[in-house]
Amino acid sequence: MNPAFAWDELALLWNANNFGAVHDWLGERWNTLIQTRSKGQEDPDAQFLQGLAFAALSFHFTQNHNQDGAALLAEDALAMLPRFLPVYCGLEIAPVLETLNTLLPQLVWLEHDADCPMQPFVFNKLVYQVMN
């Protein structure tokens, strides 16, 4: 992973519940990786960023009345992120998975455009380690 990625920037967005901006931040870096790495979308770092982006978009969707999209992306994130446990590139994965595992069962019986089942939306903060 590029050490120039400023996880502190991502944590500020994540911890402020600004998941739309988190998705954009991750998407920009994912796009760069798939264009510059020989494995493209199969690159492990790219897959890691994609899994985080799926989680962020799920959290964004559930708060913006798109429960079907939130469930789909939560499932995608849960399929991708466990392989990066416990820590990948300095980011702790378990807190993200815990929020996804709490949210997903609550989405199952909701109407597509229902309110977020968690009022207020409670999520684990992004935890990262400073890499030297």
Label the model's feature ranges:
Residues 107-132:
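A hydrophobic membrane-anchoring alpha-helix module
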Residues 32-37, 80-88:
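Alpha-helical junction/boundary sensor with strong preference for TPR arrays
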Residues 42-48, 86-110:
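TPR/TPR-like alpha-solenoid helical repeat scaffolds
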Residues 51, 61, 70-80:
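Alpha-helical protein-protein interaction scaffolds
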Residues 14, 19, 25-27, 33, ...:
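Inward-facing hydrophobic residues that define packing positions of alpha-helical scaffold repeats
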